[in-house]
């Protein structure tokens, strides 16, 4: 794919790279929240569906699955839909974090229903564990090379997350709560925790067939 979005000469409109109206998201209300989405490429999507249809070549996941007669398991996990889908390809399974629901989701291109372990993970609402907490520095500020440069006029205060540490996540009620998570290590932790559940519950690497778990931290 040439980018996150492009102008489609046939339709005459800008197209988001993984949007596909043929394959809805499995979770209702999990698509882009236009009122709270800060990523212009996400807002450009005109469809609530997602798939790898725009990937015109075979991916590593596809070749691995093909080379093992479909026995290899391939899973892509990311905070972004385009990250997970590009790694999972056409023959794997992609999961990504929905800022609209605070859950990991996929589309009907990949699955007709969630495995129990995915439903259990989402039911526990792991994103809410960060409510009433903050993103703080790991060490004392004066131990960092540019520790005295935390506040600069050209820094953006993204959706009210603040320009200086600590960055407060708030009580979880803000429409930007999940966005703030994805802008911080909390988003990476959620992705990692979900990927670990995929590793265990899908029994990746448990036999002699090579499996593929791709994880995108963004």
Name what the model sees in each region.
Residues 1-209, 218:
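His/Asp/Glu-rich, glycine-adjacent segments
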